[in-house]
Amino acid sequence: LDRRQRQMCIRDRPIIYVNQVGGQDELVFDGGSFAIDAQGELSVSAQTFIEAFPIVTVDRSSDARLAPGDTVAEREDLDAVWQALVLGMRDYVDKNGFPGGVLGLSGGIDSAVTLAVAADALGHERVEAVMMPFRYTASMSVEDAKAEAQALGVRFSNLSIETLYEAFMTTLADEFSGLPANITVSYTHL
């Protein structure tokens, strides 16, 4: 707000800044509409990341001065980022008609944060977390993933991918027979 306010007050005129709020595909519009008077003083402001309908009163009898109205405090940076993520996810899911979301949960911090955003955006009843452990997955990761889902009240499934891996390796066995098993085989053999 401060940067926009500074830019606008150099014009020596009252300014009403109106911004939409909501997510549209990969974009998130923060809302936060406001009005400043000719001296650069904030007259009216709306909260960011929620729909708001602030009232701006223009006194036409006195050189279009703005009457003081309701103002809100700006969000802290971390709160603004959180609200942007929540709003973007909620609008993306809802506007595309999805019933909810399913996400892979590893037990790590990145998927835990994603799960928390999803639960906040959609409600715990519209989110399902799936842990897909493999032979190298630590039991602590499985336990952490389950605890994260339980803490947020999200449905949790533990589906091992071991049998999928074995089926995949069996399917490729003839193509790669006689070659050493390593990560570069797929590139050198092609």
Regions found by a protein language model. Give the residues of each.
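Glycine- and acidic
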Residues: 67-76, 98-103, 130, 178-183
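Structured core elements
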Residues: 17, 28, 34-35, 42-43, ...
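ATP-dependent adenylation/pyrophosphate-handling site
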Residues: 99-105, 109-146
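Single conserved hydrophobic/aromatic residue that forms the stacking wall/gate
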Residues: 1-6, 10, 189
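C-terminal beta-strand edge segments of enzyme domains
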Residues: 14-86
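Phosphate/ATP-binding catalytic cores across multiple sugar-kinase/actin-like superfamilies
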Residues: 80-102
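Short glycine/serine/threonine/alanine-rich loop segments
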Residues: 13, 98, 154
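A conserved beta-strand->alpha-helix junction
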Residues: 50-57, 126-131, 135-182
